[in-house]
């Protein structure tokens, strides 16, 4: 079936071949023939958009809820604030390492792209498999459910919100944000900018209220700030995990490196601006919480920010639950934006079906990857105990993040002459690797069963890799090839999408990338 069926003017776009065909026709609108625009994702993310993406993804629901977990395991205000500071410092070091990686390997995909470059396709595929199967859809489903709970809860003050209503609202939220990101990249970044400003303003309001209370002489909670502190290594590690949950998202911009304007400058600069802002906001917000709430209040609270507002905001206390919901909405938008690019890059490298590396011919958005991400998240919304699934990937997450930085050290040795616009002292990646090793080891001892389940999920990708990637396409069952070809062609026509110019001109044979 020829591309003329799409009815598009020059440049002409061709559909993928059927399974029994062996070539992909060239794009008649290639740069050599003077096409007005190349079929690639556009560089539309400015420095301000980048800061909003990082800040918006980091400030999700965690800072409104996680103080309870940190204080539970530290048992004192002083030690709790130290843990928050350590979590921020650790995240800054990790973000700096990723800034070097992102300016050296200017591909989207974050740790997937870096592991692929350093260690090859097999380990990179396992990283992609874990993200596809558990990490991204589970985290997005949880954020969407949290958003729905905070929106519906005011209507049911004396009981839990209806299960079905929460899940339907969560699904509507996911679908709406998917549509926004399919429509235009600018729509997604504008939504992100708006909701980032809203959540930062909400936290500033909490900080100001806390400072007012301090100035009024409410310092009793800090007079013996370390009294009752728990110095048990296991408790401290669990407290750090709770803090790091709130700091997660510092690698968001590395998922979309190819869409950043002047990434050699703006990627490290956006990270350098975002990380101090978030760390300072988190520490000051906790100071505000601890000024007003005693330890028992924090322990009994399901959402510390809401309890704080009830005691300080008076008739305006309703604004904080709304702020939490808006924070979740913005965080979900950033997660959808980033994870769709991960699947896009994975497909472009031959680790996922070709259809996921297509973009809309007019809007230049990865519509199939966004729809795939949406579908996976909706599936997990059906799972009643979806919150339990988050326990399965703590081990895998820190393993692959740490492995990315090990790859940074390896590439320093293997490819010393590569241009590196940002080159850190080796002190930073070495410290981060050591700390990541600790974060990988702790769950193995403190939460062995869930960690082993997480390892099992990762290893389930091994046969998938050998059957779907390593095995030559000609040796795969004809039935599967025909199904994939049909689904790809139908998706291409329904979504009005084509392969990017990189796929068409440099990978004409659509070869699978292997080691």
Swiss-Prot record:
The chain crosses the membrane at residues 45-65, 79-99, 115-135, 168-188, 195-215, 236-256, 267-287, 312-332, 364-384, 386-406, 425-445, 452-472. This is Y+L amino acid transporter 2. Keywords: Amino-acid transport, Antiport, Cell membrane, Disulfide bond, Membrane, Phosphoprotein, Transmembrane, Transmembrane helix, Transport. Residues 66-78, 136-167, 216-235, 288-311, 385, 446-451 are extracellular. Signal peptide: none annotated. One of its GO terms (molecular function) is L-arginine transmembrane transporter activity. Residues 1-44, 100-114, 189-194, 257-266, 333-363, 407-424, 473-515 are cytoplasmic. Heterodimer with SLC3A2, that functions as an antiporter which operates as an efflux route by exporting cationic amino acids such as L-arginine from inside the cells in exchange with neutral amino acids like L-leucine, L-glutamine and isoleucine, plus sodium ions and may participate in nitric oxide synthesis. Also exchanges L-arginine with L-lysine in a sodium-independent manner. The transport mechanism is electroneutral and operates with a stoichiometry of 1:1.
